[in-house]
């Protein structure tokens, strides 16, 4: 049988996340086929990909049924994988398809082990009602052994950062190599310097944008633009209390984002133990330093004092105020060249070169 070279199996394309961007780049750059669980109009345009796209159609609006459909879809609807030499799995559910590819090469690109199963298990449970907690625990008991069994069948595990490499070792007892996610550094450019600091992290509790808002309510002479959306939007607007120096730009398109990044003084990004974090790299590609946090993937991308400032791992609004006052427009300009040089280490070309070598390796 003549086998096709390779295919990527990814959870879904229902929105434009970092994992989806990575898979899109991989399929486009290496001419790989793609299989996925679901898609929506909010995700990437898969019609531009050169290879075959296979929709497993495991989407459902009902939480419990959605979990069953995902399990069934990736376990039972991926028999076509036997036609490929190499399968790359990306996401939480996609690895369940490994049973349908017993021969050939199986590569798992791990963005993170499911955080609701491991390091953020108690955090997730604490945010749920009693019935939801019971359902969540029952699902975890069902899913965790299936997930771990699938991971142990992989030939190669790739971590997106040293941070994730440690999680894989701690929680799954497996070794992993590191290949950082791709940043399209050619898409972000220094355009100038206006009078604002920029946050474009998703408005999710783990991104801790609330701490930024609290800080800027105490700095009326400093301007903050928040260019994103998410479940915390209304809470953050209430927290901002109508302060004129804080602007909520909402969801912006790619061109608007490039313009906002390219004209900022600096960008702000303080997530809780971020897996890797591509937005600081995009900021540095535009010559803009990052006010970040000294934990997670940011320790691998930001050079303290040269491409930004890192505050302590559990920052307070006062920490942000001090950092913003230190990261003046003049100091930010002095960091431009080193920022651009550092971002080049995470380019799309380097990512594709390393992934291509891994696929071809025997």
Model-derived features with residue positions:
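Aromatic "clamp/platform" in nucleotide-sugar-dependent glycosyltransferases that forms part
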Residues: 272
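Active-site donor-binding segments of glycosyltransferases and PAPS-dependent sulfotransferases
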Residues: 33-97
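A charged, aromatic-enriched C-terminal amphipathic alpha-helix characteristic of glycosyltransferases
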Residues: 69-71, 315-319, 333-360
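Nucleotide-activated donor-binding/catalytic signature segment of Leloir-type glycosyltransferases, i.e.
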Residues: 234-258
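Conserved donor-binding/catalytic core segment of Leloir-type glycosyltransferases
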Residues: 189-207, 213-221, 225
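Membrane-proximal helix-turn-helix segments that form the acceptor-binding/catalytic region
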Residues: 125-157, 165
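Short hydrophobic beta-strand element within catalytic cores of glycosyltransferases
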Residues: 289-292, 302
């Amino acid at each position: 049988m003549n086998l096709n070279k390779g295919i990527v199996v990814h959870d879904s394309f229902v929105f434009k996340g970092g994992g989806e961007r990575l898979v899109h780049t991989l399929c486009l750059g290496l001419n790989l086929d793609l299989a996925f669980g679901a898609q929506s109009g909010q995700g990437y345009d898969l019609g531009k990909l050169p290879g075959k796209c296979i929709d497993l159609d495991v989407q459902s609006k009902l939480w419990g049924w959605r979990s069953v459909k995902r399990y069934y879809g990736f376990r039972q609807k991926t028999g076509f994988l036997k036609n490929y030499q190499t399968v790359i799995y990306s996401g939480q559910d996609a690895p369940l398809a490994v049973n349908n590819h017993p021969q050939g090469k199986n590569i798992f690109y791990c963005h993170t082990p499911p955080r609701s199963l491991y390091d953020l298990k108690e955090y997730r449970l604490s945010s749920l009602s009693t019935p939801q907690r019971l359902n969540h625990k029952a699902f975890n008991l069902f899913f965790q052994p299936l997930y771990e069994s699938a991971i142990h069948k992989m030939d190669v595990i790739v971590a997106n950062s040293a941070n994730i490499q440690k999680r894989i070792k701690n929680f799954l007892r497996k070794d992993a190599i590191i290949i950082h996610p791709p940043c399209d550094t050619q898409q972000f450019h220094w355009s100038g310097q206006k009078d604002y600091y920029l946050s474009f992290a998703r408005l999710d509790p783990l991104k801790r944008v609330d701490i930024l808002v609290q800080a800027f309510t105490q700095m009326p002479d400093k301007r903050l633009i928040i260019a994103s959306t998410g479940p915390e939007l209304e809470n953050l607007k209430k927290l901002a209390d109508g302060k004129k120096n804080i602007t909520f730009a909402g969801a912006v398109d790619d061109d608007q984002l490039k313009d906002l990044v390219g004209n900022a003084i600096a960008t702000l990004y303080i997530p809780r133990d971020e897996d890797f974090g591509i937005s600081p790299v995009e900021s540095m590609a535009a010559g803009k330093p990052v006010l970040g946090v000294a934990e997670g993937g940011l320790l691998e991308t930001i050079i303290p004092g040269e491409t930004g400032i890192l505050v302590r791992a559990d920052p307070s609004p006062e920490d942000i105020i001090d950092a913003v006052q230190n990261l003046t427009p003049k100091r930010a300009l002095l960091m431009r060249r080193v920022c651009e040089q550092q971002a080049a280490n995470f380019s799309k070309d380097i990512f594709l070169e390393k992934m291509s070598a891994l696929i071809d390796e025997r």
